[in-house]
């Protein structure tokens, strides 16, 4: 079993302290996603707004217990985000910043693109969308149909994206598109909003309301050549193979959110059902052990990706297990409070609704299982 050392324990303590500010707005976000503006000046929101999640000279740092952190390691990220998610994952997702787009820009952007992009985040609270998922093919890069067509000295972007976090709030984003068939024909471009031909609408949801999911329609949106990420790189380093390194770093962070939701549900039962029959207590203990098992898997995944960003098999396994864990544990915990549990215990009901969303963040479980199975086959191991 992996135990957090003193340094990571200090980070966990600071995250738990900061998470208290999210508790004041979490329930309100369920009714009004714009309630996030009330907490933008809290330490946690200020930090999330400018975090880069990658080694950089201007990465903001936080201190705790005499240690300094910049969240440039995946292990630090999973420790930090799990604690925040225990309080309210919707509030975490409502934060300004570029938790997914930022690492991609750091990887593929040239110096001018990186400076321009991160200057936007430093200037004011800025929400950034990450538009990959499409209505017909989900997040399957091979089925991507959004087009980036040459147009004079630049390009025109045409297509539709769906289930894009923070899209209605964003004034900046990354869109994935295709310039030609095949894996080497995929590109990621920087887009500003509003823009002619760009339409963004909010999608109704019953869980993760703070994430403000949206649909994006692009009709010949003008894209300057200097907004195409990876233009200075060879084709093999700017397409989907490079994106995989970013996805591998993001998946343990998403898994940490699912684990945080499951932890919160178990802790809720322990607080509100102090007297349990032996069989019921055994079931709760089994749920808690399952949470810890997936947590250990995710910590191992984070260390593996930190060691080799191309090694994503554990990251995919952890993300799939955490998504199932969040759903199973929250539903099981509702059973401790009878038929009216969702009405009588709205916080637990919210956890159950939010848990459903983890499945669809950063690739559904069938995608993650394919990644794991392909890795096993490639390594010559039986499945």
Model-predicted regions and their roles:
Residues 107-128:
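FAD-binding glycine-rich core of flavoenzymes that anchor FAD
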């Amino acid at each position: 079993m992996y135990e957090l050392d003193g340094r990571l324990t200090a980070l966990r303590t600071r995250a738990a302290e900061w998470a208290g500010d999210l508790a004041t707005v979490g329930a309100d976000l369920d009714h009004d996603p714009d309630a996030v503006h009330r907490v933008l000046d809290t330490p946690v929101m200020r930090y999330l707004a400018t975090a880069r999640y990658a080694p950089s000279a201007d990465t903001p740092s936080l201190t705790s217990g005499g240690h300094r952190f910049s969240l440039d390691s995946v292990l630090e990220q999973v420790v930090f985000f799990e604690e925040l998610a225990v309080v309210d994952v919707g509030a975490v997702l409502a934060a300004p910043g570029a938790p997914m787009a930022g690492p991609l820009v750091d990887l593929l952007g040239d110096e001018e693109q990186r400076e321009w992009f991160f200057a936007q985040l430093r200037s004011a609270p800025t929400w950034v969308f990450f538009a990959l998922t499409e209505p017909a093919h989900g997040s399957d890069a091979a089925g991507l149909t959004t087009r980036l067509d040459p147009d004079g000295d630049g390009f025109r972007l045409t297509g539709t994206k769906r289930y894009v976090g923070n899209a209605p709030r964003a004034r900046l984003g990354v869109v994935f598109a295709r310039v030609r068939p095949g894996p080497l024909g995929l590109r990621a471009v920087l887009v500003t909003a509003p823009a002619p031909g760009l339409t963004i609408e909010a999608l109704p949801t019953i869980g993760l309301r703070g994430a403000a999911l949206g649909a994006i329609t692009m009709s010949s949106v003008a894209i300057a050549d200097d907004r195409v990420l990876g233009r200075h790189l060879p084709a093999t380093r700017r397409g989907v193979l490079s994106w995989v390194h970013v996805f591998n770093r993001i998946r343990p962070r998403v898994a940490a959110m699912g684990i945080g939701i499951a932890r919160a549900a178990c802790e809720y039962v322990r607080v509100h059902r102090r007297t349990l029959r032996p069989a019921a207590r055994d079931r709760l203990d089994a749920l808690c052990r399952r949470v810890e098992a997936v947590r250990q898997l995710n910590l191992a995944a984070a260390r593996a990706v930190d060691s080799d960003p191309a090694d994503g098999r554990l990251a995919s396994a952890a993300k799939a297990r955490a998504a199932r864990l969040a759903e199973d544990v929250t539903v099981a915990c509702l059973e401790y409070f009878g038929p009216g549990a969702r009405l009588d215990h709205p916080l637990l009901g919210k956890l159950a609704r939010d848990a459903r969303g983890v499945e669809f963040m950063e690739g559904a479980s069938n995608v993650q299982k394919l990644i794991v199975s392909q890795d096993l086959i490639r390594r010559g191991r039986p499945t």
